Regions:
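Sec-dependent signal peptide recognition
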Residues: 1-7
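Compact alpha-helical subdomains of small soluble proteins
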Residues: 56-131
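Short, functional N-terminal and low-complexity linear motifs
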Residues: 3, 25-31, 45, 57-60, ...
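N-terminal signal peptide c-region/cleavage motif recognized by signal peptidases
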Residues: 12-14
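Immediate post-signal-peptide N-terminus of mature secreted/exported proteins
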Residues: 17-53
């Protein structure tokens, strides 16, 4: 009888629906930071990625997503979705522009990268400067 009552109470409880993964602020912000770092390292010849750190941060983010209730498939699909990639690229470009990066001016990207490294921001943690 107790099991039946427990089962009925569980079945009647409302299910907690997750927000779409693209609305999870920490996940989106972290992936955008990664996109900013990637753009900087691909533009500035004196800045490179700290690949072990990048990999570690990605795994940390995957664990965070799982703890929030998202599946590995949800996370992978979000990361690989073309629409989301374009949205994140646009947000990364806007961030870079706001930070002083100017398209066609390589040194401006290097300067933003060095500033991020000096600040110790998430973007800066993903990068290393050879200067």
């Amino acid at each position: 009888m107790k099991i039946l009552i427990l089962l009925l109470s569980l079945l009647s409880a409302p299910a907690f629906a997750l927000d779409p993964i693209n609305r999870e602020a920490h996940i989106a912000a972290t992936l955008i930071a990664g996109r900013v770092g990637d753009t900087i390292r691909n533009t500035c010849p004196t800045i490179s990625a700290r690949m072990f750190v990048v990999y570690g941060k990605l795994k940390e983010l995957e664990r965070y997503a799982r703890a929030k209730g998202y599946s590995e498939a949800d996370f992978t699909a979000f990361r690989n979705d073309a629409t989301e990639k374009n949205r994140m690229k646009a947000e990364a470009a806007a961030y870079l522009h706001g930070a002083g990066a100017v398209e066609g001016d390589v040194e401006s990207y290097c300067r933003v990268g060095r500033d991020e490294i000096a600040k110790g921001s998430l973007i800066g943690e993903l990068l290393r400067s050879s200067q």
